[in-house]
């Protein structure tokens, strides 16, 4: 998989059958993660029509993750609707995306982990005025999607587990003796060759 694209469903805080068809993972209002109908790998090749269609002209190689929220939301004048994104969903989103990035070896960058609203300005793929996710709980109104995306990416990065580098095996206590002996042997054989 090449990237992860984050959405809101524009529905209630409950996961619907339609949500399952369009996203690989959906987070309900309580922060629970639900699997979609299709696996992320189904989006490796979308020519067969059996894949999660979540982003116009950008589904191939893309994992679609959504928060179930924002039914009735209006961008201008802003109204979050009756089912706004919750803080619980934002935290669950960061954990899920961190796990997926680790599992699929996706680096957290603006080009590889982005919201639907960032696809057009970042990847230059037209998206018909999508603004998910340009607003999060605590914001008075939507903001620049890349700025909001940077906040989400920072949360995702903060949830990623550091890669443990195994310690160098300890050398046996007598290794210094073997090293010294090898140097002496090397010096003696050089003298004998001359």
Label the predicted regions.
Residues 68-194:
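Basic/polar, cationic surfaces and motifs that engage anionic cell-wall
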Residues 1-111:
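Active-site-adjacent loop/helix surface patches within enzyme catalytic domains
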